[in-house]
UniProtKB/Swiss-Prot annotation:
GO MF term set: nuclease activity
GO biological process: rRNA 5'-end processing
Gene Ontology cellular-component annotations: cytosol
Class of enzymatic activity (EC top level): hydrolase
Cross-referenced SMART domains: YqgFc (SM00732)
Entry similarity comment: Belongs to the YqgF nuclease family.
A Pfam family this chain is assigned to: RuvX
Keyword terms: Cytoplasm, Hydrolase, Nuclease, Ribosome biogenesis
Task performed by this protein: Could be a nuclease involved in processing of the 5'-end of pre-16S rRNA.
Principal localisation: cytoplasm
Compartment(s) where it occurs, according to its Swiss-Prot or TrEMBL record: Cytoplasm
HAMAP family, per the entry: Nuclease_YqgF
Full protein name: Putative pre-16S rRNA nuclease
Organism field: Coxiella burnetii (strain CbuK_Q154)
């Protein structure tokens, strides 16, 4: 997908919350934009549709959680299922990114910015990191 101005929505999948970020390939930057509530991984698809339309997204990126040794876990399968549903429902190109350590990195960056209040939810910041990783991969192609 190189040499195109792509606008991507990135997702940090969780069973209770799904973080969302938006980014684009012109500046290779991303911003955290939303945390969507989910019930056992099920969410309001209309909210995602609204985000896709609002941001004019033309590609979707989903973080896939693996264990540190690269093995898969229950959440790995659930995130892949979510990714397949996204692609089927909206018909947009989809990329999956290894998201190991994104939540830890999101916390580190939160405190590095001098924000002392303990963050309750970092899902959208984790989505931003997932999307930044994907954007970097696009830049290197």
């Amino acid at each position: 997908m190189p040499n195109q101005n792509l606008i991507a929505l990135g997702f940090d999948f969780g069973m209770k919350r799904i973080g969302v970020a938006v980014g684009q390939t012109v500046t290779h930057s991303a911003n955290a934009i939303a945390i969507l509530k989910a019930q056992d991984g099920v969410l309001d698809w209309e909210k995602i549709k609204m985000l896709i339309e609002t941001w004019h997204a033309n590609v979707l990126v989903v973080g896939i959680p693996y264990n540190m040794d690269g093995s898969e876990q229950t959440l790995t399968f659930a995130a892949r299922k979510f990714a397949r549903k996204l692609q089927t429902r909206f018909g947009l190109p989809l990329s999956m990114v290894d998201e190991r350590l994104t939540t830890i990195e999101a916390k580190r960056q939160w405190y590095e910015q001098g924000l002392t209040k303990r963050p309750q939810h970092l899902d959208n910041y984790a989505a931003k990191l997932i999307l930044e990783q994907w954007l970097q991969e696009q830049k290197n192609e």
